[in-house]
Amino acid sequence: MEKRSTYLDFAENDYKFFMYNFDHEVFGTSMAALGQNICERYLKHIISEYAQPCSVEEEMNKKAVLHAHSLKKIMRYMKDEMQIQIPSSVSNAMKIIDGFYFTTRYPGNDSFIAGEEEIVDAANAVKLTREFTLDIIKRLEEL
């Protein structure tokens, strides 16, 4: 039987791609959106695999957050529904890039072409979120 792909599998795959390009200074506006999306998938893996809703309403909330593209909303769910505290260094890094998924992909009032500064912010958030996620997974697996 073939192994089911998880949010972590997709996050790790894009992490390698993102970091290769970052390390080789291949910067493009899509890197900002990809950085946010990688962070989303790391956090969504924790929710998908470890959140245990006890009611239909809680199950609906879980499904809704797994479709969200707001890092703040995803972090709030982890704090409120799963009692997982995200270190301020990690949450602050994600707050900086929250919104890049849309503002760097589509034209509009808040859209912009991401530059090196935003790509560096995205890389920082990705690294911190990855480290946090792998640590949380390890802790949850030990329970």
Predicted regions and their residues:
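Terminal alpha-helical segments
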Residues: 1-143
